[in-house]
Amino acid sequence: MRFDLQVIASWIEPGSRVLDLGCGNGDLLEYLKKHKQVIGTGIEFSEEKAARCIERGLTVLQGDFRQEVRDYPEGRFDVVVLSQTLQQISDPKELLIDLLWIGKRVIVSFPNFAHWSARLQILFTGMAPITDQLPYEWYNTPNIRVISIKDFKRFLRLFGVRTVREMAINTHHHDYKGTIVRSFKNLRATYGIMMLERVT
């Protein structure tokens, strides 16, 4: 399981009701179901990946989670997970409002576009950066939002959302190993992970 997913799993309490958005092949859900006895549901856009999840015995809906989340009542889940997907969302503020409505807490992970390797590429080549975390050319990337850890924290302050936990990590896109970054996070971390809740 990817390193960021390992961190996310460690933050989830046993027996929690979990919704995993963009759950991919279901690695996180399967782990949580097996090791933490969660009541887990996933939503995955890809028919192929959703079918794989179902083959693994997971409860997964195939569809656009931006629409699907609006069908759930307030507080339906203890935790909603949005892993490495926020940068592909056209209306992140609207989505987070919906997620904080249906989930008591929301865990978000995203690639840090301010990592030093991306900065150096822009500085020395003058071109859009391509890194292990951002492996696309500018013309074929699914990423439509450029987020840094600093940007996201500022957004949360303006938006009035409380950060319960946060971690900056250094890992490659599909790596099972990584390190926790404790200083100069916006410069040195490849990913940010945050647990959020509404301020009541």
For the regions a language model picked out, list residue spans one by one.
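Glycine-rich SAM-binding Motif I of class I
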Residues: G26-E30
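S-adenosyl-L-methionine-dependent methyltransferase catalytic module, highlighting the catalytic core
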Residues: K93-W101, R105-T200
